């Protein structure tokens, strides 16, 4: 398989392809400014505060009145609160949510005047005014086309904003939902005895049909169905001089080589909570779940390990001198099939790139094994990993990852039956043990 690329898919469907395009903010609070838009107190928006403010604008895109959940704290924040929090962490100086809101409004009015002053004819001015009238203050100063006019901002945050732009979706956090349980009960098939005069017992009830065969003990405890099971999944980087897989660094890793029958059942998450994290158009999570089967849908929360050594790996991408970036996966089945595996990388709920691979079965020890090994990671993902790693704080990385997802769909190539659908969401690991994960079943009550 060749290097990943954007454009029309290869004949065998093996390459990465680009795909579809990708209000608390600015409201409330006193203005805190004079009639000319200048601050009412000297130093309120000093250069260091303004620098941090601009960085925060790039990190936290407009999200209306939605709240963002910071998983390491478990608290919900509006965008202006996050910006104020960022300023405090970066500069040690306190700015309130209302001060942030007022500053956004001041900049929005200033930006509106600048744009209109540069337009010469009245028609263009009217059109620009109508467009800006539909935008909130936060949208006006955060729109990518206007970002360059806002003055200096941190190179790391600005690069990432331009690289990872898109409309914001609602917040999402995996709830700790326990599976529904119900006390056992029994039904007696023997009619009650009665000594009442004239009582005639009803005819004997027909015996119940034999129960359906039980699914494998692991099935409710691992990522898989009776038809197809995920055995292993990993995304990794290998240094240029690697001689075996032990030298690779694992960003994420799932191993289900020996699922334990005694493990607790998977917790459940309502699939509707994450619809907007994935494309709404054909092939999106909602449409796939509507088609089913529902027992084939899973959610995996990864805590990714981004500590992959010194700058030797930072020197290049998958095609350069910085090592090999790849993805490997392995499945097992009792059926002989040809699998098609589609992996869609999504930003703000929009598909960015897709890779489609096909794999035939190998018979091993009475079971059919499917291995998709060392599939090259697309350049988009490699660049994203490097830019993400440049952010100085973990919570900044998690804020970016809040809007990064992957949807992986495995089907039977010949019948087009959906066998497994897995939604992946991400945070940054702080564990000394490296990458961690948790698997959930996706349900819809």
Curated annotation (Swiss-Prot):
Residues annotated to bind DNA: 38-114
A cellular component annotation (GO) from this entry: transcription regulator complex
Biological role: Transcription factor which plays a key role in the Hippo signaling pathway, a pathway involved in organ size control and tumor suppression by restricting proliferation and promoting apoptosis. The core of this pathway is composed of a kinase cascade wherein MST1/MST2, in complex with its regulatory protein SAV1, phosphorylates and activates LATS1/2 in complex with its regulatory protein MOB1, which in turn phosphorylates and inactivates YAP1 oncoprotein and WWTR1/TAZ.
Localization: Nucleus
Organism: Mus musculus (Mouse)
Protein name: Transcriptional enhancer factor TEF-4
Region feature Transcriptional activation, mapped onto this chain: 172-445
Biased composition (Gly residues): 25-37
Region ranges (Disordered): 1-47, 191-217
Biased composition (Pro residues): 199-216
PROSITE patterns given in the database record: TEA_1, TEA_2
Gene symbol of the encoding locus: Tead2
PANTHER family, A to Z: TRANSCRIPTIONAL ENHANCER FACTOR TEF RELATED, TRANSCRIPTIONAL ENHANCER FACTOR TEF-4
UniProt-listed InterPro entries: TEA/ATTS_dom, TEA/ATTS_sf, TEC1_TEAD_TF, TEF_metazoa, YBD
Complex formation: Interacts with YAP1 and WWTR1/TAZ.
Main location: nucleus
Tissue expression as described in the entry: Highest expression in brain. High levels also found in lung, testis and ovarian follicle cells. Lower levels in heart and spleen.
Pfam families: TEA, YBD
GO biological process: cellular response to retinoic acid; embryonic heart tube morphogenesis; hippo signaling; lateral mesoderm development; mesenchyme development; nervous system development; neural tube closure; notochord development
Keywords: Activator, DNA-binding, Nucleus, Transcription, Transcription regulation
Example of a GO MF term: transcription coactivator binding
């Amino acid at each position: 398989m060749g290097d990943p690329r954007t454009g029309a898919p290869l004949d065998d469907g093996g390459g990465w392809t680009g795909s579809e395009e990708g209000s608390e903010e600015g409201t409330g609070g006193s203005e805190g400014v004079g009639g000319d838009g200048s601050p009412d107190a000297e130093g309120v928006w000093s250069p260091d505060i303004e620098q941090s403010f601009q960085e925060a604008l790039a990190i936290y895109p407009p999200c209306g009145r939605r709240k963002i959940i910071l998983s390491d704290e478990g608290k919900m924040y509006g965008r202006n609160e996050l910006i104020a929090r960022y300023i405090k962490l970066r500069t040690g100086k306190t700015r309130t949510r209302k001060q942030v809101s007022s500053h956004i409004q001041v900049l929005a009015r200033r930006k509106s005047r600048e744009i209109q002053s540069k337009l010469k004819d009245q028609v263009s001015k009217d059109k620009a005014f109508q467009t800006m009238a539909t935008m909130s203050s936060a949208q006006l100063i955060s729109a990518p086309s206007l970002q360059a006019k806002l003055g200096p901002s941190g190179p790391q945050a600005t690069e990432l904003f331009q690289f990872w732009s898109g409309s914001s979706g609602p917040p999402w956090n995996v709830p700790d939902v326990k599976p529904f349980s119900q006390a056992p009960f029994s039904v007696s098939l023997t009619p009650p005895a009665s000594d009442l005069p004239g009582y005639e017992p009803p005819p004997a009830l027909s015996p119940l049909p034999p129960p359906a065969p039980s699914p494998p003990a692991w099935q409710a405890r691992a990522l898989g169905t009776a038809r197809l099971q995920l055995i292993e999944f990993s995304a990794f980087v290998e240094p240029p001089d690697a001689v075996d897989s032990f030298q690779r660094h694992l960003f994420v890793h799932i191993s289900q080589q020996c699922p334990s029958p005694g493990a607790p059942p998977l917790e459940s998450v309502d699939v509707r909570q994450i619809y907007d994290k994935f494309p709404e158009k054909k092939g999106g999570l909602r449409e796939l779940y509507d088609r089913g089967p529902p027992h084939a849908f899973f959610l995996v929360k990864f805590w990714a390990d981004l500590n992959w050594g010194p700058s030797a790996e930072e020197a290049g991408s998958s095609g350069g001198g910085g090592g090999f970036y790849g993805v490997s996966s392995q499945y097992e089945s009792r059926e002989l099939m040809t699998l098609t595996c589609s992996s869609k990388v999504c930003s703000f709920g929009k598909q960015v790139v897709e890779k489609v691979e096909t794999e035939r079965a190998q018979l091993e020890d009475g079971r059919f094994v499917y291995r998709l090994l060392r599939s090259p990671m697309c350049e988009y993902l490699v660049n994203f990993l490097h830019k993400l790693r440049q952010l100085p704080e973990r919570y900044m990385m998690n804020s970016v990852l809040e809007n990064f997802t992957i949807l992986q769909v495995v089907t039977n190539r010949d019948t087009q039956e959906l066998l497994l659908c897995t939604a992946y969401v991400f945070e940054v690991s702080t564990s000394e043990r490296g990458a961690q994960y948790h698997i959930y079943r996706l349900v819809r009550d």
